[in-house]
UniProtKB/Swiss-Prot annotation:
Membrane-spanning ranges: none
Annotated signal peptide: none
GO cellular component, one term: cytosol
Swiss-Prot/TrEMBL keywords: Nucleotide-binding
Name of the protein in its database record: Nucleotide-binding protein GSU3204
Pfam families with a match to the protein in the record: DUF520
Gene Ontology molecular functions: nucleotide binding
Function: Nucleotide-binding protein.
Similarity remark: Belongs to the YajQ family.
Amino acid sequence: MPSFDIVSKVEMQEVDNAVNQTVKEISQRYDFKGSKCEIKLEKDAIKLLADDDYKLKAVVDILQSKCIKRGISIKSLQYGNVEPASGGMVRQAVDIQQGISKEKGKDIIAVVKESKLKVQAQIQDDQVRVTGKNRDDLQDVIKLLKGKDLGVELQFVNFRD
C-alpha cells in the first residue's frame, strides 16, 4: 500500500548559519553602533537580548530575513514574550519548533478526513503517516495540505509505493 510521512523538521545547521549572519550584520550596521545587542543559539531556542524594544524588533527582522534566505520557514520559529532584563535591556526567547505536536497532528488528520479521500492518517511520535490504496489519492492529500495554513511548516517525505 502506498504511504508517505508528514513531518516538520528544521535543519539546525541552517539555523546556526542564519544566527551567525545576523550577528555579523548587527555588528556592521550603523544603527547598532555602541549597543549591546546579543543573539545566541542554544539547543532548541534562540535567545535575543537588546537595548530596547525598537532594537529588539530590528534584530527579529534581521533574523527573519536571514532565515528566509537560508530556506528556514518562519512558521517554525515560535516567539516568546518580551521580558525586561538587567540594565534596562529587553530579552526574548525564540523556540525552534521540531516535529508535529499532537494537537497539530489531530488537526492534520481532521483535514484529511474532511476531504473524503480514501486514505488513512495516523500519528506516529512527531510525524503523521498517510496510507492509501491509490497513489493519486496520496498526491491529492499532499496538494490539499499544501493549500491549507495549519500554522506549521510541513514536509512530505518517505513516499513509498
